[in-house]
Amino acid sequence: MKYNTSTLGRRAAAAAGVLTLAVLGLAPMAQAENANHGDINTEALGSLTIHKHLNGDGNPIGAPDGTASNDDGKGAPVSGVQFTAYEINGIDLKTSEGWAKVNALTNTGAIPDNACANPGQPTLPNYTFRSSRVSGDTDRDGEAKIESLPVKAYLVCETKTPGNIVQKAKPFVVTIPHPNTAAKADGTWLYDVHVYPKNEKIEVAKTIEDQRNNGYIVGSKVRFPVSSTLPKLDDNSYYKYYQFKDTLDNRLKQVTATDVTLGGTRLDEGTDYTLGTDGQTVTVTFNQNGLSKLKGNPGQKLQAVFEGVVSEVGDGSINNTAQLISDTTYAEQPPAPETPPANPDNPPTTEQVTSKWGDLTIKKVDGNDRSGDKDGLKGAEFQIYKAKDAYADTCSPEADGQPLTINGESTFTTGEGGTINFKALFVSDSVQDTGRDNRVDAPHRCYVLVETKAPAGYVLPADASRAITVEPGAGVTQQVVIDNVKQSVPGLPLTGANGMLILTASGAALLMIAVGSVLVARYRERKRNRDLAA
């Protein structure tokens, strides 16, 4: 059945044209009460094509017939968004009265911004809904389509949104058909209507604080600043919840979050946010006072620093990512904060950052020991320093700064086996930034080991400073073996085998002297007797 009524057409053009201005991104000139409309085919089935983009330059990006008007100014397409079209009861587009009702919905506040607050039960004053039709998810180009739509008026709600979209599109009403009254359009009825709702996106970033600020050895902290730039929300759009969430590696102990700031100003725990810890998972969840500050500071940087103390090395790579879990709603007044979902679908997640560590074992041995497996020496004392050239290809024993400390101690002593194990020494991290004490993906880092005291009875070596090369991972860096030689001491009383040998030799010499003396005496006596006989 077809209707061809001039009054009907004018009301339709005026109502539908005005109604969809914000959704379609059309300028006010798009409405034309004297449109050259054609017949409405009430038996036809139409479609709604949704083009979903981030907010761009604020100018219209397309027309109801699908022609683009501002390709350069539109924001990036948004995939993964789903829309539902709810058929409105009580609006008959076959009558002038029906189009008058559509026209009334163009009045300010006629379509509440929170009409879709509960997608399962949308609300529209003075109207109910008959049935609904759901689009597929928007594709990589930001497009989705609802097909086979009868000639009706529909409330359209954004009913599924990716986690990185902080502000949904406002609900809107669309008619099938729609008068094609845009500039340079032909004024006919469009049964395949295109709309261009927009979103506000939010992102989250993570880095690693320069390790020089926190130490280079086991017991030092690794700190991960997590930040987001706050979007501008509509006046009657409010945060339902806003949370930073970070699950830290098991090799980090005493995990927590500190230094929560907004635009560089510190926020207060309890007053502005709640700190939660569940095992290795740490959350910073903003309360009503904090959410109000977030809404009131668009464009400002919100940051929290997650941290833990290094206890061991494992494979050498301590990886970390964080999530931002947030949502908004349209309301007349700020709603009470809701509890963020524990496992939301695809929340904004930071890129992975990595802090790399290695370990070091040294063994002090007796340099005079000629056995294959030398015994360790207890009581040798060492200090360890950063190397002046930390990332030299060949490490040198030139130290930089003060000795490294563990719990305030800078001198470490060999135990019963003659060993000291440094369970973790910093190698590098994945953050490239000018001025950091770091080289991304460095294969090793140089340290300097200094022996400050030899074990009792042993001599401190002349080369007490030794260059050490530490590689990422436990047990990767070869054990360092350091010799000590015994002290020189005065001669001892000779009571052993060597003394007996000397005594024997001395006795033999005395005996030879005695025998020689006897022989000489006898020779002289015989000579004297011969002389007397003569």
Swiss-Prot record:
Main location: secreted
Propeptide: 496-534
Topology term for the membrane: Peptidoglycan-anchor
Keywords carried by this UniProt record: Cell wall, Fimbrium, Peptidoglycan-anchor, Secreted, Signal
Biased composition range(s): Pro residues: 334-347
Stretch list, region Disordered: 56-76, 329-376
Residue numbers of Pentaglycyl murein peptidoglycan amidated threonine PTMs: 495
Subcellular location: Secreted, Cell wall; Fimbrium
GO BP annotations, alphabetical order: carbohydrate metabolic process
GO cellular component: extracellular region; pilus
Sequence ranges of Basic and acidic residues compositional bias: 361-376
Role played: Major fimbrial subunit of A.naeslundii.
Protein name (record): Fimbrial subunit type 2
Organism: Actinomyces naeslundii
Upper lineage: Bacteria, Bacillati, Actinomycetota, Actinomycetes, Actinomycetales
